[in-house]
Amino acid sequence: RYGTFPAGSIGWVISRERFMQGAEKWLSNLKLRASYGLVGSDKISDSNDDRFAYLQFFQGGDGYSFGVNEFGNGYSGLKEGNFANPNLTWEKARKLNVGLDASFFNERLTFSADYFFEHRYDIITNLSDGNKLGYPGIVGKDAPFINSGIVDNQGIDFEIGWNGNIGEDFRYYIKPNFTFARNKIKFMNEVSYENEWRANTGKRIDEYFVYEFDHFVYDQAEADKLNAMNGGTGFQPWGKLYPGDVVYK
């Protein structure tokens, strides 16, 4: 299958402009750059069986009976090897990057800063995974791969470097960097929850839900008080509390 993914970039070397004359004594390079483009991915999984998920195939199986031969052995037939999706297409992402590069003192001090934004859509996903809308087990096959899902990711990246010599035989280069990024699931084809906070849409990828620590049970008197709550079922649903146990909010 074919796809077209255009992209482009521009740059402005500010240090070469006339108004920067005289700065070359301390400024080696100053460049502003930006790029924007559409990229595609056809990676579905690490399994070779999924490489052609848009094509239906069949395989031999003994799940269907077509009678027996003269020796009493059953004839095996064909069964669906997968449920294909002929409309499956590329997973796409629109990417924006804006950056600034600078170097000083004959390239000894370098600096780079970037802002990046990615809007990923038509995400290839299998509805049978996790809490997505899939087929019931009685079907005997996983739901087909589809293009469903939108995720935004953005962040900043900084790095600064210094290089120099110690004597004639030793050269060093120091280059620390800092990156901060946040993603957000804008849409996921998932089941409906009675408790909306369990939904993945609107949250970060692989965001975990955990109980928040409040305090430890001080003594038996407090434990008895907590265990008597909610009509005797206890403050927490997973068993009685004892001195030293954790109490969650």
Identify what each model region corresponds to:
Residues T201-Y208, G234-G244:
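Glycine-centered loop/turn motifs
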Residues N227-M229, T233:
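Structural flexibility/helix-modulation signal
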